[in-house]
A protein has these predicted regions:
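Short, surface-exposed loop/turn segments at beta-strand-coil junctions that are enriched for proline
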Residues: 111-115
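Aromatic-Pro/Gly-enriched surface loop or interdomain linker
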Residues: 65-100, 120, 127-272
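Short strand-edge motifs at loop-to-beta-strand transitions and within beta-strands
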Residues: 106-110
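Extracytoplasmic low-complexity segments
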Residues: 14-88
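Extracellular glycan-recognition modules
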Residues: 3-13
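Short, structured interface segments
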Residues: 12-19, 137-143
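Flexible, glycine-rich phosphate/dinucleotide-binding loops
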Residues: 10, 41-43, 163, 268
C-alpha cells in the first residue's frame, strides 16, 4: 500500500507499484507511507511487523496472524519458495476467523513455589463447586525445572506442537469422513458441541477458514477446549493427545521415577542444553 500527499498521475502510480525505492526522489518526497508486505518475511514469515520504506518510518503491525508470504500481484510462478523470491510473495491473506491471541484480561496468577517439582499441572475452575463437564474446567500448564539446570536424569518432552495442530478442531462436526476416520459414529463431548457453535475460539490446522482456505497457523494464546485432562477426543475410542500423554507421567510417578517436563516450545526456543 502507498499513501501520497496528493493525487498522482497514472505513470507515477505505475512507478510506485513497481517499487518505492526505484522511484525518482521527487516522487518519493510526495509519498507519506509505502508499506512493503514482503520486506521482512524472509527470516520471519510469521512476523506481525509491517515495514514502511519511506523516511517517515510509519511501521505498522498486523493483528491475529493472517497468512503472510502469499503470492502477490507480480507473481511469475518461476519460484515456488517464498524466501527465494520474496518480492513476488508480498500479499497477505486475511480471514475473518484468524486469531493469534484472545487478549483476555488476567483473572488470577500463580507464583510457582521454589521447591515444587517439575511436572504437568492444571488450574481447576468450578461453577458453584459443581463437578461436571458443564461446570468444571482444567487449564493445564507445565512447571519446568530451573533454567539451565536438570533436576532429574529423565526429561519428558510434552509434544505441544501436536496439541496445537489439533487444537479446537471441528472435524467431528464438519468433516464428511469423520465416521470413516474414527471407524465408528463420532462421540462428541460437550466442548465439541460448544466449539461447533463458537468458532471465535479459533481453529485447528485440520480445519478450514470461513472462506474455504486451509488453516495454516494455530496459537496457544486462547482457550483450547480439547487440550484438557478429562477430554476424550472423538477420533479415538480411548484417549488422544494430552490426556493420553498424562498416562505416561502418571506411570512414571506410580513407578517413582523422577522426571523433568519441558515442551516442544522450550526445545525450539532454548535448544537441548
Amino acid at each position: 500500500p502507498r499513501l501520497s500527499k496528493k493525487a498522482l498521475s497514472k505513470s507515477d502510480i505505475e512507478s510506485l507499484a513497481r517499487g518505492f525505492t526505484d522511484c525518482t526522489s521527487e516522487l518519493r518526497s510526495e509519498v507519506i507511507g509505502a508499506w512493503d508486505f514482503h520486506a521482512n518475511i524472509t527470516k520471519n514469515i510469521a512476523s506481525t511487523h509491517i515495514i514502511d520504506k519511506t523516511s517517515n518510518h510509519l511501521n505498522g503491525f498486523i493483528i491475529n496472524l493472517p497468512c503472510r508470504g502469499m503470492t502477490g500481484y507480480n507473481w511469475t510462478s518461476d519460484e515456488m519458495v517464498f524466501h527465494h523470491k520474496p518480492e513476488e510473495y508480498g500479499a497477505i491473506h486475511f480471514h475473518d476467523d484468524d486469531i493469534d491471541d484472545a487478549r483476555w484480561d488476567v483473572d488470577f496468577t500463580y507464583k510457582v513455589p521454589d521447591l515444587i517439582r517439575s511436572g504437568v499441572y492444571a488450574a481447576r475452575l468450578r461453577i458453584n463447586g459443581e463437578e461436571s463437564a458443564e461446570t468444571e474446567d482444567f487449564i493445564p500448564f507445565v512447571i519446568k525445572p530451573p533454567k539451565g539446570k536438570a533436576t532429574s536424569k529423565l526429561c519428558f518432552v510434552l509434544p505441544t506442537n501436536s496439541y496445537l495442530a489439533y487444537s479446537n478442531d471441528n472435524l467431528g462436526t464438519n468433516s464428511v469422513v469423520a465416521q470413516l476416520l474414527a471407524g465408528k459414529v463420532p462421540v462428541l463431548a460437550a466442548s465439541d458441541l460448544y466449539l461447533n457453535e463458537h468458532r471465535e475460539y479459533g481453529l485447528s490446522t485440520y480445519s478450514k477458514h470461513s472462506d474455504g482456505s486451509g488453516v495454516a497457523i494455530s496459537s496457544r494464546l486462547r482457550p483450547i477446549l480439547n487440550m484438557r485432562p478429562k477430554y476424550r477426543h472423538w477420533l479415538s475410542p480411548s484417549l488422544w493427545q494430552l490426556n493420553a500423554d498424562l498416562h505416561l507421567t502418571d506411570w512414571l510417578e506410580e513407578k517413582k521415577i523422577d522426571f523433568d517436563v519441558v515442551t516442544d516450545e522450550d526445545l525450539h526456543l532454548e535448544g537441548v542444553e
